[in-house]
């Protein structure tokens, strides 16, 4: 499959977010000093990073009900009749006695970037993942959206997941998701040396979670006591999150479940994309699309392999 097949109109829907995501809200909120944004493409470690930052902020919190109460998602719209002004007002009304942490799948300029000294002191924890792995994880995740949620938004299930992985890739996979993954990093890569941007790779988090969680703590400025570190590491482990996966499934966001149980915390692996449908041909097509978007060779290599990006 050639990368040219992802051009709009060839095999599936045009690029763009699903109807339950509104990218405008993050441009309208009143940003504050101390705000933290967890900016990650879909299925690239978003939930893990949200929980990491929350656990660092609290020194270890096993009792929260839904991570989306603790780390609100700047783009999610709970109902087609939701009033965007009201959703923005809710973000602005969040208490001032605790630093806000937000989730976003966006990159600048969709997500406003406040350069150091040029506005509110906002910190951006930016995570990327091997594109093959992210796309492999996306199809089962989309398939796990509840019938009620898809019916509410009038989105046909077969239109987003396809009959098999080849059809999924020929549709929104190559039209929207792969360009989004590479476009996200293309926007953040030039900002990686900014003092308020931390670029982390999912594979590095997996290879050495404790070192990278400490790195995130240093970056965002949360001081964790020696006594609290064991709890932070436990509550951010895959085993703990899998055992408490109901805390990570958007249960408080809408009036009924958005996801089937088990949709968010699935495998947490690296190097296993072939198990979910990434053939050598699809992998080559992903890379071909990627090179047309992410033209910096160093950035392209880092996108796939990880290791520190701050050189």
What are these regions (language model features)?
Residues 2-200, 255, 263-311:
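PAPS-dependent sulfotransferase catalytic domain
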